[in-house]
Amino acid sequence: MVSPQTRKEEELLEKQNSVFYLLTLGRKPYGSYLHIKIELDEDEKLEKEIYADNIKLENELRQLKRLYEVYQSVEIDDAQKAIQKEALLTIAKILSVFDF
């Protein structure tokens, strides 16, 4: 039996189809920075920037790119849902750097 809390979490996952995010890695004279902008809808936007040396997100970004490519080629709903969950976990790893 599925608990109400689990059901609610599943529903929230379903509604996250239209989240857009932009991740920028840059360099300034005093160090590296990572900027993220997330648009949940037209009215709700989150932006955050952190400054740090040696920001290591290359693996996560490569994994997101691979997941996106695989998602486009898969036509089976169950496989697409599994890829979506993996992509959300990878995005969560990236967001953990920002302390959201």
Curated annotation (Swiss-Prot):
It holds the Pfam family DUF5517. InterPro entries: DUF5517. Signal peptide: none annotated. This protein may be involved in virus assembly. This is Uncharacterized protein A-100.
